[in-house]
Amino acid sequence: TSINTNIVGKSGLERYYQNDLAGEPTQVIFKGSEIEQIVSSTPGKDIKISLDVNLQKIATESLLQGMELANDNFESRDEINKGAIVVLDIETNKVISMVSLPDYNPNNFVDGISKRDFNKLNIAGAFNNYPIQGQYPPGSVFKVVAYWLAEQEKIYPEGLSSRSGRIDCKGSLAFGFNDGSQQVYNDWKEGGHGRVNLGASIKESCNVYFWDIALKIWRDFEGTSAESILQQYAKNLGFGSPSSIDLPYEASGVVPDRNLFEEWSISQPERVRPEGWLGGDLMNLIIGQGAITATPIQVA
């Protein structure tokens, strides 16, 4: 018989680095009632984290204020009670701030909490680490992927041959699909952004310019392996797979394409329409909408 009393990390860094932090405890091995052997302990290692304490405080306060303002200004929506912030050092790519709300105090679990309190935290989502587990459509920040694609592959709106070429963004674009997709898409800015090139389109967040790129991809490559060129660029930037941060239970997010829609039609038919992957899905994808999801750390 051996006696081994261990403190086990249940979540976060403590769980990820459990073996390093815990070390090896002293073990007393008995044979009957006699001590047969004492195995000396090995102390756990220290770990150094990259979080900036002051920035962490500022980020937490900012997120709380942002959620409060959102709730004050959008009365018709459900209450916003969840949020995440991730800040990376642009030179080292280390996480210098990470906030997930709602949260909880792990010290309360040292002596145990009531089932009622546990259920309240669980229902509120306090045990979720939203920076790495929350999966949401990334929205217009995804246009950076399309920008990179356009630069590298020289794929521009129809009629343009360089990044300096301009289109007239009038606020909507008619696609003329014959596959059942939506025919007219309206930009977020009524009336459009005027004459824009690639640089201006990312600065102004012009949907129409990027829809034009998606339309060219669809017309040139539909049904070929190159049809998913945008998705491949997204995956090369880390979308659709874990970031490999040293935290447990990281989500992957989703980068949708024709093959995934075919898989879903069998395994999760409620997620897709019977027609499968259409041109309109690519239009949604290029502006970070539709079936695509990403975690905050992937976006960061």
Label the model's feature ranges.
Residues 1-44:
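Small/polar-residue-rich segments within soluble enzyme cores
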Residues 18, 22-25, 33, 60-68, ...:
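Amphipathic, well-packed alpha-helical segments that form the structural scaffold of globular domains
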Residues 22, 43-67, 100:
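N-terminal leader/targeting segments and the immediately adjacent pre-domain N-terminus
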Residues 26-42, 51, 77, 83-86, ...:
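Beta-lactam-recognizing serine transpeptidase/beta-lactamase-like catalytic domain environment
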Residues 57-84, 103:
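Beta-lactamase-like hydrolase cores
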